[in-house]
Amino acid sequence: KLRGLGYEPGLAEESVFTAVKAPVFSFAKLSTVDTFLSPEMKSTGEVMGVDKDHRVALYKALIASGLYIPRGGNVLIATGEWDREDCIALSKRFSRLGFRLMAVEDDHNHLTDAGLLAELVPEDSILDFIKTDKVSLVLSTHAKAGVPGRLGFAIRRTSMEYNIPCLTSLDTANAILDVLEHLAECGEPDIYALDEYSRYDRKNG
């Protein structure tokens, strides 16, 4: 019995740490698959980030999953029509962090109408911008996920093939902005070995 091993019944004490799990996908091995997530997609594994702050835990999980998060540079915005209004506030946050905005025509018009400074990227030059490292981060929520002939599919696949982080959801983008704003204010996170977490938890629990 568990009691004979020294375990007591009931719930464990709440930890001072937050753990965030992130899925890992094998997009690099599947050349015709869109990176825009859909309900039928399955991850090939999971990783976990742990920290006292949930934003840092997310940051660690994303890094472990292979998603590099740049601290600056050019962010390319290519969203669906339904996302453009919400994208304005998000773009302002990117600008405050020092990112330079780049956008396809419809997004560019929407951003400039809102008073934001953004560079217009011609549609026939978008993939070249990604391939030549002129873009540090991509936000692509174009519709018709999985359709090879669509611009959104081409942007997402090219970003993946050239190791440019590509976000396909405004919720994810906002969460990553929370992380970047926290790191800008508080600096780099602490890194612990796994056994150090249990010792810290007992000491501070």
Regions found by a protein language model. Give the residues of each.
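ATP-dependent carboxylate/acyl-activation modules
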Residues: 1-167, 173-176, 182, 186-189, ...
